[in-house]
Design a protein with these regions (language model features):
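Conserved C-terminal alpha-helix-loop-beta "cap" of PLP-dependent enzymes
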Residues: 182-276
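Active-site C-terminal subdomain of aminotransferase-like
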Residues: 97-206, 210-214
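Glycine-/acidic-rich phosphate or pyrophosphate-binding loops and their flanking alpha/beta elements
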Residues: 29-30, 54, 151-154, 250
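Hydrophobic alpha-helical scaffolding
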Residues: 17-22, 44-51, 69-70, 81-82, ...
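Conserved PLP-enzyme active-site core in the AAT-like
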Residues: 1-140, 146, 229, 233-238, ...
Length: 286
């Protein structure tokens, strides 16, 4: 929805997904033609499942001359293959999971990764820093091709770029340097274990059904309450009023999934919190 409002003159086509949350390759084939500029997927998907058909999607996109872009959660990349390994031309996402605390809608900043080619780099709207070396072997740094940037274009800029974004980028860089490759792997494995535990416990509650099986979920997963006879809004109201718990995101307003809600765990979610949610739902749905 944000893309539709952000990029004037561009048509966004939504492609159907299978019951397990994977992209419907037949539906993708029906919309692909030489007028398609790019195929964009989110991995993990909005519903939390890991898309395992990345290379097939990339091959189909490239066959019609389109680029293949992947919106990837950086917290998952310690345990999930990076987009470049399954054919992505562009990788992008948000750096918020990298040690940045949410604060009144802030704490957000995007990352963008492409091959070092002019067709990509010259379209970057942000500052690009170059390095040069003088005769004495001293290094200097400079802003390269500033006319590309929204900072240079001012009123004609196409996105927000402020000091806070740079500060969040520094925070994310420090977080990554401290964590290192092993730390990011440990982070991903911790989230996977907690997600698996939460799904196992919640799916055992009468009236609760786990959707998009048997796909592996990373952080998010979808719970359906149709069998309980209660709506998501009812469940969320009781969770908040009786147990001081914020319920899952109500998907019934935008997706044909019945009374379903999107839940999420992170590395900071404790087993005690998961058990507390389970007990609360048991009492609400009893």
């Amino acid at each position: 929805r944000q893309i539709l409002h952000y990029c004037v003159g561009m048509e966004a086509i939504h492609v159907a997904y299978e019951k397990d949350g994977q992209l419907d390759l037949n539906a993708l084939a029906e919309v692909l033609n030489d007028q398609i500029a790019c195929v964009l997927i989110q991995n993990p998907t909005f519903f939390g499942s890991l898309e395992t058909q990345g290379q097939k999607i990339a091959d189909r996109a490239h066959a019609v001359g389109a680029k293949f872009a992947v919106y990837a959660d950086p917290a998952s990349l310690g345990v999930v293959a990076p987009p470049v390994q399954y054919g992505a031309d562009i990788a992008c996402g948000d750096i918020q999971p990298l040690g940045i605390h949410m604060s009144y809608g802030s704490g957000l900043g995007g990352y963008l990764a492409t091959p070092v080619k002019a067709e990509y780099v010259l379209n970057y709207p942000h500052h690009l820093y170059g390095i040069f070396e003088n005769d004495a072997g001293e290094r200097g740094y400079f802003r390269s091709l500033p006319e590309r940037t929204s900072y240079y274009r001012r009123a004609q800029g196409v996105e927000f770029l402020g000091t806070c974004v740079g500060l969040w980028a520094i925070t994310a860089a420090v977080y990554l340097s401290v964590m290192g490759p092993q730390g990011m792997k440990d982070l991903g494995e911790t989230i996977l274990k907690k997600s698996a535990y939460a799904k196992k416990m919640l799916s055992q509650i009468p009236g609760v059904r786990l959707l998009f099986q048997p796909s592996t979920a990373f952080q998010e997963f979808v719970l359906n309450f149709d069998e309980s006879g209660k709506s998501v809004s009812e469940v969320n109201k009781r969770l908040l009023e009786d147990h001081k718990i914020f319920g899952g995101v109500d998907l019934s307003k935008h997706y044909d999934l019945g009374q379903s809600a999107l839940y999420c765990v992170t590395e900071k979610t404790s087993q005690e919190q998961i058990d507390r949610l389970c007990n609360a739902l048991k009492s609400i749905l009893a």
